[in-house]
Amino acid sequence: MYSKESCERCEEMEKIIPSGQGKKSIFLSGSIRGGRQLLETYRFIYDALEEAGAEVLSWHVADPELEKTESKMTEQEIYARDLGLLEKSDALIAEVTVPSTGVGYEICRALVRKIPVLCLHMPDVAVSSMVLGNPDTLMEVRSYPDKEALKEIIIDFIRAL
């Protein structure tokens, strides 16, 4: 489990400890090392979740300063942080337009733990068959043509939790 003691170099620890009572805790998953070209979309998803009354535990995915923060952490600290946050989550929302081993791993871990998963992607992209072909009833895959549709999909998912 991720704790302040296990990551003394992580100066932003207080931001990742859940504080909201009664809010849905969401793990936001998106490509980090595979490319940050969708950072604006991650930020939009983060804002839509906050607006819907959810708490985003993995806020760092939408943080433009992520590389600076994570450069102070070991691989083991990042792994422990992310899995600790996933364990506390009511659901996982993954943006899967950009292929990412880490995102796929987080989706799989969430499903194994019986955590509902929403995978989002832009239209006309080659999303992995491991995502599109997954028959797990806890996983939903949705394409969004624009930000208005993206927000609506997110709000509907949160309300259904």
Swiss-Prot record:
Substrate binds at residues 27-33, 42, 60, 106, 128-130. Coiled coil: none annotated. Monomer and homodimer. Its EC number is 3.2.2.-. InterPro entries: 2'-dNMP_N-hydrolase, DNPH1, Nucleoside_deoxyribTrfase. It catalyses: a pyrimidine 2'-deoxyribonucleoside 5'-phosphate + H2O = a pyrimidine nucleobase + 2-deoxy-D-ribose 5-phosphate; a purine 2'-deoxyribonucleoside 5'-phosphate + H2O = a purine nucleobase + 2-deoxy-D-ribose 5-phosphate. It comes from Methanosarcina mazei (strain ATCC BAA-159 / DSM 3647 / Goe1 / Go1 / JCM 11833 / OCM 88) (Methanosarcina frisia). The lineage of its organism: Archaea, Methanobacteriati, Methanobacteriota, Stenosarchaea group, Methanomicrobia. This is Putative 2'-deoxynucleoside 5'-phosphate N-hydrolase 1. GO terms for biological process: deoxyribonucleoside monophosphate catabolic process; nucleoside metabolic process; nucleotide metabolic process.
